[in-house]
Amino acid sequence: MNISIMLKPASSNCNLRCKYCFYNDLSSHREMPSHGMMSEQTLRSTLKKAFDFAGHDRVMLSFQGGEPLLAGKEFFLKLHDIIRELNVNRAPVSIGVQTNGTLIDEEWCRIFKRGGYLVGLSLDGDETADSLRIDANGNPTFSRALNGAKLMQKYGVDFNILVVLTKQVANRIEPIYRFFKKQYFKHLQFIPMLKPLCVDESGKPISKTTYNEPFPS
């Protein structure tokens, strides 16, 4: 039996302000929007419970956000140390991280490669399709995310592309697919946009019919 654990090391903190982000909208309505960065004590306690329960079974760790890389490189290097210390049964461990890709540099790639990570990179297509993904200052993030993908290719990091299927993306699915193919992105995931608590006209959620249109059976 596999043990699967989702961790949010940066809580809801994110360096992007994607116009369709339901989680940013959701967290802003909570009594405590962010719980801050995960402490080493919390990480250690969580992993100890996981390995004690798993025995020899696989432990799957999934880091999401917000933007999990905001927790910093030292956090993930410490993660590797704690795994080596607590995994006394030498259970197989899988590590995944879902990121917007804008913070990825060569050192991050070495961390990913060393830990055997599977990285999910959020990218909605070419520069036009990715226009809803802006940073906290309202600036586009496409080139930074694409650079992160190219660096991971350079270092041989396993990654896939996660696409939020908005109407804007659905209407341009063929050129977007050609763009991904040109970049040699081999693994693509398309997920429907979820309706935030408040939605403006720039990013409308799509219907089930619209979601299915780009993928005829």
Predicted features by range, described:
Residues S12, M37-Q41, E106, N139, ...:
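Conserved structured core elements
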Residues G36-E40, P92-I95, K208-Y211:
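Glycine-rich, flexible loop segments associated with nucleotide phosphate handling
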Residues T42-T46:
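Activation loop
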